[in-house]
Amino acid sequence: RQGIRPLDRVVLQLPNTPEFVHWYLALVRIGAIPVLALRAHRHTEVRHFIRASGAVAYVVPDVAHHFDYRPMATQMQGEFAGLRVFVVGEAGAGQTAHAALLQGQPDDEVTREIRAAEAAVDPAEVATMLLSGGTTSLSKLIPRTHEDYVLNARLCGRAGGFDAQTVFLVILPLGHNYNLASPGILGAFYVGGTVVLAPSTDTAEIFRLVQQERVTVIA
């Protein structure tokens, strides 16, 4: 309903929250391409990602770890005509709140469009754009295809002993390949395992989650 189509690039800059998972899976399901930014990236990096990928949308939290992402998103809107901004939390002027997207049910026409988009996804097409380490300059975009990334997650999960009893605790950023698909959350989901998202790197919180959720794998 928001006009995001197959092969559209969307810069995704969210912390380790359920909304990251919702956005990532929704985008790849219809053949749109998430460009994964890390929470520490600021104007210079985000501008580069939008320009290099040709992104049509940018997804951010309102405030995370004492930083308000909305003014930065507003600046990007001023620099890139037509850029849509979606905010998890309270949206700023000219931005769309994530919660507003969840109101009501999609009508029959939208449902048909979604199903058609899902059916048309080419396994050999780009599914995700990861970032290089950026040790010598701004990070480069690394395209990963649907078939490549599913195989990557499946084989890494097999090597890691993932199965339906796996309870995977995510601590490192989901925007990294490691915790996304090596084997990451995709490896856990592939075998029907459980994913637990740590809200911080606080040691006491981590140990509490390990005990409470009976965690079997940490990354």
Where is each model-derived feature located?
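Conserved AMP-binding/adenylate-forming core of the ANL superfamily
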Residues: 1-25, 42-47, 99-106, 144-147
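Conserved AMP-binding/adenylation subdomain of ANL enzymes
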Residues: 31, 150-167, 177-217
